[in-house]
Amino acid sequence: MNLIEQLEQEEIARLGKTIPEFAPGDTVVVQVKVKEGNRERLQAYEGVVIAKRNRGLNSGFTVRKISSGEGVERTFQTYSPLVASIEVKRRGDVRRAKLYYLRERSGKSARIKEKLVRKEKPVVAA
């Protein structure tokens, strides 16, 4: 590990943010800090993760949602002070790292199957 990577790891540890494991295709709710005048509030932004960029401290992800019939995408920096929290609502079952093809789709064809997590049964010795 070189010096720059080490400094980035120390900075991530100093921030103390707990970022859940999520991947493209997952539906997430991002709580964003919004400043209006002199007060600050949290705004929820829920949508499908269509891209994720893992670059240490410079990591980011893009969330797409349909708002009033119009597609809206927003890119967030994972360790930004404006991102208060990230919550995973459901896991998506996709075979791509970047889901940019969802931009051309609408309605049912833009939906993503849910990933079903199997619980392993304990093996009983006979």
UniProtKB/Swiss-Prot annotation:
The keyword Amino-acid biosynthesis does not apply. GO terms for cellular component: cytosolic large ribosomal subunit. One of its GO terms (biological process) is translation. Keywords: Ribonucleoprotein, Ribosomal protein. PROSITE patterns: RIBOSOMAL_L19. HAMAP family: Ribosomal_bL19. This protein is located at the 30S-50S ribosomal subunit interface and may play a role in the structure and function of the aminoacyl-tRNA binding site. This is Large ribosomal subunit protein bL19. It comes from Dechloromonas aromatica (strain RCB).
